[in-house]
Amino acid sequence: MKKIFSIILAASVSFSFIGCENELNLQNPNKVTDGTFWKTVGDFKQAVNAGYVNQKFMLGYSGYTGTLMRISRGDDVDMVAPNDGSIAGFTNTFDNGTAQAYFSMFYKSIARANDVINRIQDKDFSKEDKDIILGEAHFLRGFCYFNLARHFQNVPVRLIASQDPADYPLATSEQSKVYEQAVSDFSAAAGYLPLQNPNKAKPSKGSAVAFLGKVYVYMENWKLAKETLEPLTKSPYTYKLVDFSWNTTAEHEYNEESIYEVPFSMAGGSDIWTWGEDPNASQSTAMACQFAHPAAGGWRQARVSRTMMATFLAEKDKDGKDDIRARESVAWDYPGCMYYKQSFQEFFDKNDPALKSEYWIIKYQNSKTQESEGDAKSAINERIMRYANVLLLLAECELNLQNQDGAIGYLNQIRDRANLNKYEVSYAKTQEAIMQDIINQRAIEFFRDGERFDDLRRWGLIKKALEAGKDNEYHTQQYINYTDKYQYFPIPAKEIQTNSLCEQNAPWK
């Protein structure tokens, strides 16, 4: 306050000397403008930080509505009380508000990344500072374009930061070109970022390489995907599989399996339900309360489907127990199961006997450490890229390159961690059988992570999966309503209305 008063006083004195002879051009010292910003390394780091908004924001990738949108279309969950029933039931249209917000959040981050990339080129900063700023900006832009391509298909590719309305009209690029832009950005990020980012919440070289390999998988460029991902299994990288439970709670975040996480904490303001960029926003996530039983402070928006449980329980481990990944992801009525610090049986006998036979999501929940999700705040990071994903993507690459032994080798690393028998002990050495185990292992490993529907689409299995679950009350309408146009979301109406060169993608015209 004292400093502000001094500035105002100095301005007043200056004005008294100048009088009316000259116009006085005063800038508000408390307002950030292009003229006062973009000066220091700190300014650029703040600008990059603003680009992460789409990943944490309520409407963004790992936010409340973004996560529910990504998981609601697969066969692995039953959307009991969906946040957006039209998306879950395949009746959404181009004016759907949830998809519009999700789409816009990516372009908001892209605009911020573009600003950083465009403006830093002529700055006289150290190479170290420039590299990490450019690396993060390219990573963020690549992340956005990868997800826009896999969720909306053909979209505009914007690479220039501009406030000029004349620059806004832009035609869509084909999905392959959008993926190519993601490849370009992740490749650039891998060249700029350090092997280990000093800030664990930020991407590293390995993060960029892992996503680059994943884009190649989506492009079905198996050779390049293998060549990209394989180095992550060797020195100088030190990734490895850890106890699966370490990937589901707050206690072991940033462990050796983690390649990229979206961070949450109890820091920040008090506003949990932040629909805009609010200085009072909490840095926590509201996801944990979405799936818990109401008696544990939850909303019971979704539960584990019986189709998914059949996959979880298809194999016993070497000790005759259910798969540890099932037990760490789901609570159900089995001996020793705990649910919000009570035995599962005790909790439901006391609170809701009728729902005792259901399967309850506990992955990324506070069930082990809290009695309730009542305040709706959680600090559990979302694990966006794990080493397990790299191994299973490599298994898929090897299989598509006709190297069955290589695929089985990667599968066995996943199976060993789960204490399952080696693949060859239980299954046939055929392309079909190996692929089926890849499908099953991905469903189990990445349950609740929002991978399932995209996996089913790229394998051409959406209709088959929906047909298998059509007798489930929560999936009957999905089966009835689904047509191929629902493989991707339509370009939102607002983009079509405001971008004169943007045309709706063919299935939605």
Regions found by a protein language model. Give the residues of each.
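Acidic, glycine-rich segments characteristic of secretory precursors and extracytoplasmic regions
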Residues: 4, 8, 20-69, 115, ...
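Conserved, well-structured interaction surfaces
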Residues: 40-49, 53-59, 81-152, 173-176, ...
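Elongated scaffold/linker segments in the mid-to-C-terminal portions of large proteins
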Residues: 42, 48, 57-59, 81-104, ...
